[in-house]
Amino acid sequence: MYKIYSYLGWRIDMKTENLPQAGQEAQIDKKIHFIWVGHIMPQKNIQVVSEWAEKNPGYETIIWVDKKIAPAKELDLFILDMKSKGITVKDINEEGVCRDSIRHELDQESPNYGMVSDMLRLNILAAEGGIYLDSDILCSAPFPDEIYAPFGFLLSPWSQGANNTLCNDIILCSKGNQIIQQLADAIEQSYIARDSFEFTHEYASMKETKGERIAKTLGVTGPGFLFHQLKKMGILNDKSEMEAIHWELQDQRYLIDGSVKEPDYFYVPQNNTNDASWVPSIKRPGIENMSFQERLENAVQLIAFDIQKTGLFNLDHYANELKVKQNSWCIAAETSPELKPDSYLLIRPRDKTGEWTLYYVDEDKKLNPVTLPVIKGAIKLSEVSDPLRKFHTLLSQVSDPVNPTAHELKQIGRALIELKPRQDEWHCKNKWSGAEEIAQELWQRITSNETLRAQIKQCFTQFESLKPRVAELGLTRASGAGTEVEAHESTVKEQEIISQNTVGEEGTKEKNSVQLASENSSDEKIKTAHDLIDEIIQDVIQLDGKLGLLGGNTRQLEDGRVINIPNGAAMIFDDYKKYKQGELTAESALESMIKIAKLSNQLNRHTFFNQRQPETGQFYKKVAAIDLQTTIAAEYDNNHGLRI
């Protein structure tokens, strides 16, 4: 049996037999919930919440905060101010709504507040019932004195112009509602499994871009999660993929009215543009006042949670969060008043044709100018080639920071040409000197716990990729880890010695013959790689205009035509340009393209994104599946009947 219900301006085809309160209408508790964890709520959001409280005196208006990390003095003043406006402030830690997964994310050095809010709203509603609202939704009219919802649970549609999913910016439910409780349990598991949605360990230390953070949040805890979890629970009609959900928006306005007639109540988002303000990439408050030892202990607890709950060991990520900023550098329009000793300060010119000035900051915080050539026509920062890390490495290798040699200046100048930062990223952070030492201390602390040491062995993907770094840092592996590898390496070396002693002159002749054949085949292999690159780029061009949720970037073709392609495809196109300009070999370009495709495929594989632009998903899968050596060898075999 199916029923169509109209509410919040949308209609949803629901399987009533799978609903816990089938055939019932439940009254929504008279509470309006807002969430603001981290820093103190900005004034513009306070005004919005205050208006809700003023226009709905019959409802209890609540703002949920995190007293563990909010600035204490500012929070006390905030609580008093809200009390004067008739608004209650509650602490998530005291009310039993802050699960371990939520605390884990909040304790990160740069928490994803969007994910935290997604998880909190479900737990709060499960515990107290009522209405959850994002703090940027304006109130144009009061709520009705009584609101009854079919089965005690309602969601709003996606508010950014999409037409195929739900949203979680407005949620209504009755206290103890079983649907919301199941969603609260499921969202925690989705968060714990979030690393399957992230990039691989190889990229754990790279700065997460805004687009990546948006995608991960939407898919792991946001609207994408809601839609697919409700389908999984059997609440949404599964006769078709997306056709089960329909709604009608009135000029992007939310309808809070149970009737089918013209809406009486409209609630309009304060900002109807997707500016990602709900996923800020900022340090949590108070982190600057914590001692290094306190931050280290916090990191140990976070790593333990990851190992026990997610089965992943992200040592590199936490080491970089704790990195010591020595021999660091920053970019500024003018001299910073807070200079750090033993660092570099790069002053950008006020106009595009001006000269970049590099200073070395000594122990006394004195600026020592480092002469540099005039830098013009700087290339846009490439996230793949990572010139920031290259530039930092060059700086750390300068023999005399105050008086670098002419050769060192030339190298730094070349690195600067690749270093044109984005206008909103003057302060760029990478692997600072000291991360290796921190990684070593973290490793020793974690592996000193026998239980964690045993669990680390089960973190196959992360642990395997960590082994080379462990050897490089001279760290002690967990007991028994790597023994088989070392034994295998010893056996291989013995076999090599025996082979070298028995080859003789015939072996030498054969070696020369193979070498000649290899040289003759080199050009053919390069041609095969070139053809493969051309094929990939033709597929990229076909993606013109096929943009997904995160938008795209424009690129100019050789014929002058400008195409607008998805972000991952744009990065692949950038590698193609570098290959054409001789900056990358064919094999290096292909390796980078495949790597980008694998990362993009991980983001795009979620059904929520893949259904928006299936051509993009198919392209990423195709490139990601390429086995470079096998493909080139197979092509050469087909053409020449030879095995390379």
Swiss-Prot record:
Please cite one Gene Ontology biological process associated with this protein.
mannosyl-inositol phosphorylceramide biosynthetic process
Q: List the keywords (alphabetical).
A: Glycosyltransferase, Secreted, Transferase, Ubl conjugation, Virulence
Report the EC code(s) recorded for this entry.
Answer: 2.4.1.-
> Mainly resides where?
secreted
What Gene Ontology molecular function terms does this protein carry? mannosyltransferase activity
Instruction: Return the SUPFAM superfamilies for the record.
Output: Nucleotide-diphospho-sugar transferases
* One Pfam family per UniProt: Gly_transf_sug
- List the induction conditions: Is induced in the post-exponential phase of growth.
Give the span(s) annotated as Glucosyltransferase.
Answer: 1-400
For this chain, the Swiss-Prot or TrEMBL PTM comment says: Ubiquitinated and polyubiquitinated when ectopically produced in both yeast and mammalian cells; however it is unsure if this modification occurs during the L.pneumophila infection of host cells.
Q: Which InterPro entries match?
A: Glycosyltransferase_domain, GlycoTrfase_DXD_sugar-bd_CS, Nucleotide-diphossugar_trans
Additional remark text: Production of SetA in yeast is extremely toxic, it causes a severe growth defect and alters yeast cell morphology. When expressed in mammalian cells, SetA causes cell retractation.
- Sum up the protein's function in the record's words: Secreted effector that interferes with vesicular trafficking of host cells. Possesses glucohydrolase and mono-O-glucosyltransferase activity by using UDP-glucose as a sugar donor substrate. Is able to glucosylate histones H4 and H3.1 in vitro, but it is unlikely that histones are the natural substrates for SetA. May glycosylate a component of the host cell vesicle trafficking machinery during L.pneumophila infection.
Q: What is known of its domains?
A: Multidomain protein with an N-terminal glucosyltransferase domain and a C-terminal phosphatidylinositol 3-phosphate-binding domain, which guides the Legionella effector to the surface of the Legionella-containing vacuole. Both domains are essential for the cellular effects on the eukaryotic host.
Question: Mind telling me what this protein is named?
Answer: Subversion of eukaryotic traffic protein A
Encoding gene, per UniProt annotation: setA
